[in-house]
Amino acid sequence: MRIFSFLFLLLLGILTGQGLVSGTDNGKTTDVTWDKYSLSVKGQRLFVFSGEFHYQRLPVPELWLDVFQKLRANGFNAISVYFFWSFHSASEGEFDFENGAHDIQRLFDYAKEAGLYVIARAGPYCNAETSAGGFALWAANGQMGNERTSDEAYYEKWRPWILEVGKIIAKNQITNGGPVILNQHENELTETTYDPNHTLVVYMKQIAQVFEEAGIVVPSSHNEKGMRGVSWSTDYHNVGGAVNIYGLDSYPGGLSCTNPNSGFRLVRTYYQWFQNYSSTQPSYMPEFEGGWFQPWGGSFYDTCATELSPEFPDVYYKNNIGSRVTLHSIYMTYGGTNWGHSAAPVVYTSYDYAAPLRETREIRDKLKQTKLIGLFTRVSTDLLKTYMEGNGTGYTSDSSIYTWSLRNPDTNAGFYVLAHSTSSARDVTTFSLNATTSAGAISIPDIELNGRQSKIIVTDYNFGTNSTLLFSSAEVLTYANLDVNVLVFYLNVGQKGTFALKDEPKLAFQTYGNSNVTTSESSYGTQYSYTQGEGVTAVKFSNGVLAYLLDKESAWNFFAPPTTSSPQVAPNEHILVQGPYLVRGASINHGTVEITGDNANTTSIEVYTGNSQVKKVKWNGKTIETRKTAYGSLIGTVPGAEDVKIRLPSLDSWKAQDTLPEIQPDYDDSTWTVCNKTTSVNAIAPLSLPVLYSGDYGYHAGTKVYRGRFDGRNVTGANVTVQNGAAAGWAAWVNGQYAGGSAGSPSLAATSAVLTFNGLSLKDRDNVLTVVTDYTGHDQNSVRPKGTQNPRGILGATLTGGGNFTSWRIQGNAGGEKNIDPVRGPMNEGGLYGERMGWHLPGYKVPKSASKSSPLDGVSGAEGRFYTTTFKLKLDKDLDVPIGLQLGAPEGTKAVVQVFMNGYQFGHYLPHTGPQSLFPFPPGVINNRGENTLAISMWALTDAGAKLDKVELVAYGKYRSGFDFNQDWGYLQPGWKDRSQYA
């Protein structure tokens, strides 16, 4: 009986330790379960290392796989994804999940192909600095009543969206062989009252019900909006509406683009927060700061050195690990572009976000540093079940060092997370750590933190059969169980590393590289010490263990490509590669290891497969010459693109046409929409009648053109108030004569002006006031007074000096809510004449009557022009060369400029506001091998006129790539069709 009990307990320990885990489930599936330590997928614990990705902000589906491969290569095993209602629904009852980037099935397929799980976040409200927070724009005009409550009017609008998108999510759940493991309900919705009948509780119940109706069975989650409330946790005042996995969002950096000494203050109360409010659940951060957005008039992302610094992930993400977080999602990991009119007014065209992966899809040092954490968590299974042993400044020989001490109760593995107690400190501090190990108390010597640096020191760390690291002052990057157990350490150059292997006698070893290893004896065995030299050092021990000692720069170029497509990668399911810029994947076939990747410059490559049958290395399909090292790796050279000359065409053959013919008094607007409403569903009353809110007439995104008529020569002016978002300007003309307006302000959503008609020619009858308005997006929910319902367009227009307007008409994007360009979608275009006529689309034939002027010539007064040109590119097929357009304007220029590449609005340039003047285009929007149609619209906000002084194509980095960036993108670039009905 005792033997049976022992075997039973042993089996139970295996099932609940490193093997299969039984945890709490939601009663719908056991494929995804949880306990207070971590999430488990298919019975195996998982450290969820996730990155936020918004497919809408990269409208080329093929490039989603490019991004996913880069995330997987850099240690991620999941993506978190918003699904924006606004992107898929141009009008009520219509949903597009088929055309171009609207085909989200491809998103799930690519995620699965890349080996990434998916956390689905379909709202219905998302926020995300996107227009109206992701609400369909046709609904964001007041008709939903009290949004984000149980209001019946709101329910009737959002329910069809969640049902439709939910069915696709359900189809792709892990229970159906797909990648979806979690499904978020709503977004940052603070539970204000713990009352089962409260409207928010009822609303969350409604969301759960509709998702269930759609077929969702994976666990539900939610994201708390910082430490401001406690919402929807089953462990705290659960009166209904609670989700399975509680999450806490946090953006603690407080960093400044212009002041490198500001912020950098760690939050060290996450652990207590989760213990208080979600103690039976794993600690989950659905959004942790991966960067920060920048507003109109702010800084451009490339200048934000503090946000871009690799110090940030090193210190902040490791602090989260020390706080026992085991579900960690970085917002953003790839930001992308607010192309078209998809941005909320708080951001400009770029949504780079200072994220680890640049808007151009280039890998920043920030991502390289993040990879070191991702690869560590991927193999460190003991980290998935720990308790907080303690924390504070008493663990080291220097009280300026703060320590988190985590312990695995089953294996005794220890994880000590170290950082300066004052997290913003830049001191170089050397100290020893008082650690608890299976060999007793050990003082681990010569640990150095170089300013804003953090380290995870491990003890009793198993890295394979009969291989345990008793301790190490060098950080573990990863390990592999191949023909031998391979352990990978990293340190800064010049820092000291000391480690000991558990239960091992003094081992003979051979060193290959610049780091000299010495030994010393102690009560717990042999201690191996070294000072990290430059580059890579390999140490081969007589017991078979192979250790790589990497400096940080070498670690940044170290990869562990999996040989499995599963997001869960065991230590025997990856190989080790050092050297290139990117390793996308690897496989072993018939004695050859085949590696795909990218390289900027020619580099060496070292490959360790642990397979003696592997004699050759192929890089992007081509065999490279290699030599075998004494410790079993293969070393060769892979080519880069440093010698490639990128020759971009000059843009000197332009045609121009008038894009504001509506300012002329005899313009025929008889087919325009008549503004005749005297009431609005919007809760905000207009300042005058008729209602001139653009949304009330079916025009939502982009430029709007209004024409108001009045009689009499005695009218002295007009008082006009326009609200189209922060920085949005407007201009007005009377009978074709400039009358004034506003250049907009980054701090104002609405601007007013008293237009003076003195000196302007008026008629007895039928004078025309033309008002052209820019647009920077619909507000998010948090903006007063009514969030997404804050109207767009003219809030009020009255005449001074007597009389009233006799009529108003409005024109916006061609077709309004008809979505006449379903590939590019409902937010791509506005109401400028050139847009309505499709002058920006490929295949448009410019008439001979067009002038041969360019944006450098500009306009001399308050006018508008639409400039078009074509050019060809012929980049090498194996190159990834991000291309952008650099604009500039003379100081003092006040104008609204838009950039269209092959029909996509990929730039909104306000030279008087900034900050953005460089606009990148992803392949698929631009043709790297073929013809391109470039259009620029420009209208002056004052009678001083406007012109540009720089319009040139620029190349970013150059990379030899194993990814096909030069495909036929024709299906994403539908061409011109006659649009004369929208004049």
From Swiss-Prot:
The keyword ATP-binding does not apply. The active site is at E188 (proton donor), E287 (nucleophile). InterPro entries: Betagal_dom2, Betagal_dom2_sf, BetaGal_dom3, BetaGal_dom3_sf, BetaGal_jelly_roll_dom, Galactose-bd-like_sf, Gly_Hdrlase_35_cat, Glycoside_Hdrlase_35. Substrate binds at Y82, N127, A128, E129, N187, Y251, Y353. Its EC number is 3.2.1.23. One of its GO terms (molecular function) is beta-galactosidase activity. It catalyses: Hydrolysis of terminal non-reducing beta-D-galactose residues in beta-D-galactosides. Keywords: Carbohydrate metabolism, Disulfide bond, Glycoprotein, Glycosidase, Hydrolase, Polysaccharide degradation, Secreted, Signal. It is found in: Secreted. The keyword Disulfide bond applies. Glycans are attached at N197, N276, N391, N434, N466, N516, N601, N676, N714, N719, N804. GO terms for biological process: polysaccharide catabolic process. It comes from the Eukaryota. Residues 1-23 form the signal peptide. GO terms for cellular component: extracellular region. Disulfide bonds join C257-C304. Belongs to the glycosyl hydrolase 35 family. This is Probable beta-galactosidase C.
